[in-house]
Amino acid sequence: MKPQTFTWKKLAADELTRVYLDEMRRDFPPSELKPLSMILNSEAAGMAHTWGVFEGETLVSYLLMVRPMGCEVSQLDYFSVLPAYRSTGIGARLLAALPAHEEGAKAILIEAECPEKADDEAMAV
């Protein structure tokens, strides 16, 4: 089996909008999803950025990072692997690779929720 090669790219506003509409609304419950306008405004102000991870031209994953200018800590705000790529270990590989892409960050803050506390059983996987 050929090893997968991924390309990391910071998404432009139009790309992020598509990811939000097509992917994020599926991947996160409405109660946890910030409005698109808030995310776009944060990115435009330099307070956040979103990585798209691609295999060739195909989006595999996205990681929305929050880091105000001058801050040495990045926060992973949203992270998802697209359904066709889940349960393959890609998520763990991408999290391990994340520090190399967060230039200038001395730490990365990751919030995780306990699956047993999920309101929706489908979201607890």
Whereabouts are the PLM-identified features?
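Conserved beta-strand in the GNAT
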Residues: 52, 57-67, 73-80
